[in-house]
């Protein structure tokens, strides 16, 4: 039987008096890529934020690795082998590539740190080439590689990706998605939040569709790609 790594059970969340999530239920099995698609303002980023403790769930339960983390502080959740690549990359622009990666591996022992940085450079040879370059002078695609690499330095078992293709050229998007596929092959569990529904669903084992804070559909990636309502709303017909 597949092990459930993450589950939301009827989770609601609010910003002040505005309800952003409405009794959302979903799960991610160990080793899966699960994608969440939806239009701008559907609540995708809020859902990731709620998983990370900000905003807090106002009702329901969030369970990670058999632990109820609903009321945990963000820092405690992040130390529980969860890492997020935020929308907009948010690299430390005045730091070099290597310094950014060091921030991601801040809690690693020296031997672990060296192993992880070697692994990140193997995934992203461009980062090794640019390791002494300031992050702020890099292209958007290189910054996205760095943001993913920085998250991987904490050796997560669950990687959260928030709109990794946003603002990138198609050739770079393909490289990023190829790397996500590689990570899955290495056993990582990935929760991918994407507006690029076509690419995301091709890659995903399963997917959820979020509309106005409600999960309205869930199925395999292939089934959602073939679904006429999904094609019409998110795949340009």
Swiss-Prot record:
GO terms for cellular component: ATP-binding cassette (ABC) transporter complex, substrate-binding subunit-containing; membrane. Residues 6-237 form the ABC transporter domain. ATP binds at residues 38-45. The keyword Nucleus does not apply. One of its GO terms (biological process) is L-valine transmembrane transport. SMART domains: AAA. Pfam families: ABC_tran (PF00005). Keywords: Amino-acid transport, ATP-binding, Nucleotide-binding, Transport. One of its GO terms (molecular function) is ATP hydrolysis activity. Component of the leucine-specific transport system. Belongs to the ABC transporter superfamily. This is High-affinity branched-chain amino acid transport ATP-binding protein LivF. It comes from Escherichia coli (strain K12). The lineage of its organism: Bacteria, Pseudomonadati, Pseudomonadota, Gammaproteobacteria, Enterobacterales.
């Amino acid at each position: 039987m597949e092990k459930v790594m993450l589950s939301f059970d009827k989770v609601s969340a609010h910003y002040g008096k505005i309800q952003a999530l409405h009794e959302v239920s979903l799960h991610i099995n160990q080793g899966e890529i699960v994608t969440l698609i939806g239009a701008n303002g559907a609540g995708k980023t809020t859902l990731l934020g709620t998983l990370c403790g900000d905003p807090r769930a106002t009702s329901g339960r969030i369970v990670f690795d058999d632990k109820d983390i609903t009321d945990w502080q963000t820092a405690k959740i992040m130390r529980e082998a969860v890492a997020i690549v935020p929308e907009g990359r948010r690299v430390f622009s005045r730091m070099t590539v290597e310094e950014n990666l060091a921030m991601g591996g801040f809690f690693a022992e020296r031997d672990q740190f060296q192993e992880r940085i070697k692994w990140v450079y193997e995934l992203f040879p461009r980062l090794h080439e640019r390791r002494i370059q300031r992050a702020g002078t890099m292209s958007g695609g290189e910054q996205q590689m760095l943001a993913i690499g920085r998250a991987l330095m904490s050796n997560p078992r669950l990687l959260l990706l928030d709109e990794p293709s946003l603002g990138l050229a198609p050739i770079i998007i393909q490289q990023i998605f190829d790397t996500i596929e590689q990570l899955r092959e290495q056993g990582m569990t990935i929760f991918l939040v994407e507006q690029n529904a076509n690419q995301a669903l091709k890659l995903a084992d399963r997917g959820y569709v979020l509309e106005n804070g409600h999960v309205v559909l869930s199925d395999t990636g292939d089934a959602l790609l073939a679904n006429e309502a999904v094609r019409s709303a998110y795949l340009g017909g």
